[in-house]
Swiss-Prot record:
Gene expressing this chain: BTN2
Stretches with biased composition (Low complexity): 334-362
Name of protein: Protein BTN2
Assembly and oligomerization: Interacts with RHB1, IST2, TDA3 and YIF1.
Biased composition (Polar residues): 364-373
Length: 410
């Protein structure tokens, strides 16, 4: 194939451009050195703090609880989980779920010389996080945390069966329990987080240990109890079925009274613990559902109350505005009536004054403006009076020549 580096058109060595990996733009000036960038997606990190010196020396205190069961005793060991450790496990699980849910998509990019590359599209991290949160199992995370915290614990029952010892080098714990009874074996029932469902910040890892009673102590009750005698009846076809059913029931009762093996006892114990955990989980879920329902009911009542108060306040403001409008409309009417009364009194005094005045004009108009009203006042007509000046003017007018002032040609 034709290589650009060996082309006769190129006389100088091409410069090498160092393009950083985090560059997101195509540089047209350096087509030869262009290559697809490495895809960097957002990672989930826990807010880890620097460990203090005091944390390295001191460990979390261990709590003990002993409960009696029909098969023996249950010893519960619990210790507090640091919040940083819990958030670390949760973030790691979220990262795994995000990687499992991530489905990459690509688009084709072409460079200056026509070379095509597949470039990964940018993923929607928020959508991936939401999908991962839906599949997040806190119980599995709690079980893993408890398993890691109690990993180095050594639980041992002595040969006599009356003393139990617990040893942990990591937590610097060595505890011996003196037992009042003789136990045959010890086993681990299960582990997990005690308060995984509630939203409290304090979480406690829980390890349950089962102590199996000795077979003689378990079978004591069965040996002392007298067995029911088998009723012998005559050989009769009508009573054969009844006798067979009774004998089967007695055999089942005898089998139930027989002591269970150690494996069967452990299986039964674990199953009972699982059922108890399921019942407690259901009761907690029902309690949480009731609390949620009550909270929603209270919020609904509060919203209705607030809406009712807002409507009442709106009605009050509307009424007050209407009253203000009515008062503003009634005020000008009263003011106009008062001004009319004042104008009437002023007009009466003006008429009396105008009657006493004798002027040369025939008619005089008196306009008085007071307030918002305008009224016209007319003076009384005066008698016609002969004027001497007018007579002299008319007489001189009659004596004036009536010809043209232009001299006619002779």
């Amino acid at each position: 194939m034709f290589s650009i580096f060996n082309s006769p058109c190129v006389f100088e060595q091409l410069p090498s451009f160092s393009q950083p990996l985090h560059s997101r733009y195509f540089d047209c000036s350096s087509p030869v050195s262009y290559y697809p960038e490495c895809k960097r997606r957002k990672a989930i990190k826990a807010n880890l703090r620097a460990p203090k010196k005091s944390d390295a020396n001191c460990s979390e205190p261990l709590r003990y609880a002993l409960a009696e069961t029909p098969n023996g005793y249950t010893l519960s060991l619990s210790k507090r989980i640091p919040y940083e450790l819990f958030s670390k496990y949760v973030n790691e699980k979220l990262g795994e779920l995000k990687e499992n849910h991530y489905r990459p998509t690509y688009h084709v990019v072409q460079d200056f010389f026509g070379n095509q590359y597949y470039v990964e599209d940018e993923a929607d991290e928020d959508a991936l996080l939401r999908s991962a949160l839906k599949d997040l199992d806190f119980r599995a995370i709690g079980k893993k945390i408890a398993k890691d915290l109690f990993q180095d614990y050594e639980i041992e029952l002595n040969h006599r069966g009356d003393e139990l010892s617990i040893l942990s080098k990591k937590d610097k714990i060595f505890k011996e329990f003196s037992l009042d009874q003789v136990f045959e074996d010890v086993f681990v029932i299960g582990c997990g987080v005690e308060n995984i469902d509630d939203g409290s910040r304090e979480k406690y890892a829980l390890l349950k240990i089962g102590l199996v009673k000795h077979e003689e102590e378990i079978s004591e009750g069965g040996i002392n109890e007298p067995k029911m005698p088998i009723i012998e009846s005559k050989i009769d076809e009508s009573h054969d079925d009844v006798n067979m059913s009774e004998s089967l029931k007695e055999e089942e009762a005898e089998k139930a009274k027989e002591p269970l093996t150690k494996e069967d006892q452990i299986k039964k114990w674990i199953e009972e613990e699982r059922l108890m955990q399921e019942e407690s989980r259901k009761s907690e879920q029902e309690k949480a559902a009731k609390e949620d329902e009550e909270r929603q009911k209270k919020e609904k009542e509060a919203r209705l109350k607030a809406r009712k108060e807002s409507l009442i306040n709106k009605q009050k403001t509307k009424r007050s505005q209407q009253k203000k409008l009515q008062n503003s409309k009634s005020l000008p009417i009263s003011e106009i009536e008062a001004s009319n009364k004042n104008n009437n009194s002023n007009s009466g005094s003006a008429e009396s004054d105008n009657e006493s005045i004798n002027s040369d004009s025939d008619t005089t108009l008196d306009f008085s403006v007071s307030g918002n009203t305008l009224k016209k006042h007319a003076s009384p007509l005066l008698e016609d009076v002969e004027d001497e000046e007018v007579d002299r003017y008319n007489e001189s007018l009659s004596r004036s020549p009536k010809g043209n002032s232009i001299i006619e040609e002779i």
